[in-house]
Curated annotation (Swiss-Prot):
Disulfide bonds: 42-110
Origin: domain of life: Eukaryota
Localization terms from the record: Cell membrane
Protein name, as recorded: T cell receptor beta variable 4-1
Protein role: V region of the variable domain of T cell receptor (TR) beta chain that participates in the antigen recognition. Alpha-beta T cell receptors are antigen specific receptors which are essential to the immune response and are present on the cell surface of T lymphocytes. Recognize peptide-major histocompatibility (MH) (pMH) complexes that are displayed by antigen presenting cells (APC), a prerequisite for efficient T cell adaptive immunity against pathogens.
Gene that specifies this protein: TRBV4-1
UniProt cross-references to Pfam families, sorted A to Z: V-set (PF07686)
SUPFAM superfamilies named in the record: Immunoglobulin
GO BP field: adaptive immune response; cell surface receptor signaling pathway
Cellular component annotations (GO), alphabetically ordered: plasma membrane; T cell receptor complex
Keywords, in A-Z order: Adaptive immunity, Cell membrane, Disulfide bond, Glycoprotein, Immunity, Immunoglobulin domain, Membrane, Receptor, Signal, T cell receptor
Glycosylation sites (chain numbering): 76, 89
Length: 114
């Protein structure tokens, strides 16, 4: 088999969070091939008006990917189109993934703020 068939992007999500957290991210771990389509869900229950998705590669600081604030979605222009956000309401910010590349292997983090 060719290298492309064996290649997969490993997406690790923050798993060490306090039990009483009001921001949840699911699934906590995700391994997917380059042709799969998956979604990451970020949900907050604090009434915050802003939500964020970050990408953090090994030994690098987090990079802001998307912001949903006051019912407006802002997209970092450097984020490839294989990542697409969806905000069905002010407490959810989903991240849809498709056709990932090996360089997409990273820690994906969601957050919220007032």
């Amino acid at each position: 088999m060719g290298c492309r068939l064996l290649c997969c992007a490993v997406l690790c999500l923050l798993g060490a969070v306090p039990i009483d957290t009001e921001v949840t991210q699911t699934p906590k771990h995700l391994v997917m091939g380059m042709t799969n389509k998956k979604s990451l869900k970020c949900e907050q229950h604090m009434g915050h008006r802003a939500m964020y998705w970050y990408k953090q590669k090994a030994k690098k600081p987090p990079e802001l990917m998307f912001v949903y604030s006051y019912e407006k979605l802002s997209i970092n222009e450097s984020v490839p189109s294989r990542f697409s956000p969806e905000c069905p309401n002010s407490s959810l910010l989903n991240l849809h993934l498709h056709a990932l590349q090996p360089e997409d292997s990273a820690l994906y983090l969601c957050a919220s703020s007032q």
